[in-house]
Structures are given as structure tokens and as C-alpha cells.
Amino acid sequence: MIIPTPNSHRPTLEDFREAAYRVKGVAIRTPLVPLRRYREEDQKILLKPEMIQPVGSYKIRGVYNWVAQLPEKERKKGVSTVSAGNMSQALGYVANIFGVPSRAIIPDYAPETKIEASRRYGMDILVMTLPEIYEYIENPPDDYCFLNGLEEFGLLDGHGTIGLEIMEDAPDTDTIFVPVGIGFLSSGVALAAKALKPSVRVIGVNAELSPGFYESLRENKVVPVEPANTLADAINDPVSEDMLKLVEETLDGVVLASEDKIRDAIRFLAVENKLVAEGAGAISLAAALSTPFEERGNTVCVLSGGSIDPEKLSQILRSEK
């Protein structure tokens, strides 16, 4: 039985450096790429393209770091998670590295393409209804080590290596824009970046149609938000008390991006910068481009992933600006 990391966990600089050492050679140290504006480089906005990771998203960082620290006896049993997207694919990829079995519990409304994406990593797939999934999360079987992506604070260490790399590679950074869904990515980046440069501002970004953290921070309490049909569907997550406290402690604020701005950012990244980003990945650039330079200064945008449906991408590229 694996005991979850306590919700009081706040990684130190040493924790982030240890995580960086563990993931070296597995996760790519992604470069900081100047944003290209119509074939001219904009040195004031740098892109951190996590979509070039082996599984197409940043999640390999936190997942590998978590699995690597499991007791070998427990790890050999196998690993499991609840996810229809990047988390399950990252866990399947990492399980193959360690040579252990893996399982993905996927909601029955997930598109077949996402189910197949996890199956390609050799995962055992269990399709469940939402009530069944909630029961599984509350009482996971002991046959596999269960990674609860909604509550495992140990993910902060691995995800935070992004913030470490940003400040090591661009120490003059003034502002980092990062998507905020569950909260572990944005808070991990903030904790690591501020450990090296306390004055750096880290701004989380929500979609206007799914403003969970934005509204909850405004009201100073959890504000339930109905799931929305947003291009940034990968960060269409509910806000919990623990995660609201974490985000409030670590981020300098959360801003909103409209669907039009997200769409424009996806198109701009693909056409001008040759980078394919999902909506949740492009949302950081959408926010940065909507913020005057005087307010943001030297900027880094974390592009968290590239898992976008090809047909959706095609529609965006064909649509008018």
C-alpha cells in the first residue's frame, strides 16, 4: 500500500534538483525558443515547448519522478492511474522503462482515440462510469500502486523541474505564464522558479469557459464550475480546498483567456513557430499576447502539451483569423 504524499508537501530547491537528476535522460530538458512573429524573432517572449517530450506533454516529469521513488517491491506489482489523456500515456511510457505492468482507468465518455493512445503503451484498460471511477479513487485495489493525479502532491517535485530549467537558462525572466488545471504544474513551476529568483512572477491561466481557480481566488473559497466545452479541455478540472490553498500560496495570480485567443494562439504556434500545441498548451501564450510588455517584461510561456485532435487542429488552421 502506497501512502500518498501529504498535502502539506512543499518541495525545496534541493528536492527539485534531486528530481531533475532522476528524470535526466528520460524527460527532455526542453529549450527556451524565441517566439517567432511573422518570421522575426521576439526575444521578449520565450516558449518552453513541453510537447516535444516523449509522450507529448510535461507529465512525464512528475510521473517518472514518482514511479522512480516507489519501493522496488511495490513498483514491481505495477502502476495505475485514472486518466483519459496525458497522465495515463505518461504512466504507460514510464512503466515500460521500469518493465512493470500498468493500468489506465478511463471514463466511458472518453473518445476512442484517447483509449487507443493509452493502449499503445501496453496498458491494461478499464473503462468505467464516473460513479465507478469515484469509488475506485476512494478505494483503489492493492494489486497496483495507484497514482492519484488529483491529489498526489509528490508530483510537484518533477513538474517543478520546468521552473528550475527556466530560471537556469533565462535568469532575467520577469514573468512565467503557465496553464493551471489541477494545480500541480503551475505551483511546481512557481515553487522552483521562486527558489532561484523570488521576484519572478508566475501567472496561471484558466479558460474563460472554465474559470475555476480564477473565480475561487476572487471569492477566497472554492467556486464550483460546470465542465465546459473549451479548447483547453485538458485543464477543465474542478478546484479542491487543498489545491486552492496551494495555488494561492504559490502563484502571483490567475488570468483568463478567451476561446478566440486560445484558437489564435494554437494557429500562431503552428503556422509561425512550427509547434503543435493543444488548447491547454497554447493558453499560456494566449495570455501573454494579451498582456502589455510593460506589465509582463521578459516572458516565458510554458506550452504544456500537444495532444490535440488532428481534425480539430485542421479546423483551426482552416478558420479565418
Model-derived segments and spans:
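PLP-dependent amino-acid enzyme catalytic core
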Residues: 1-321
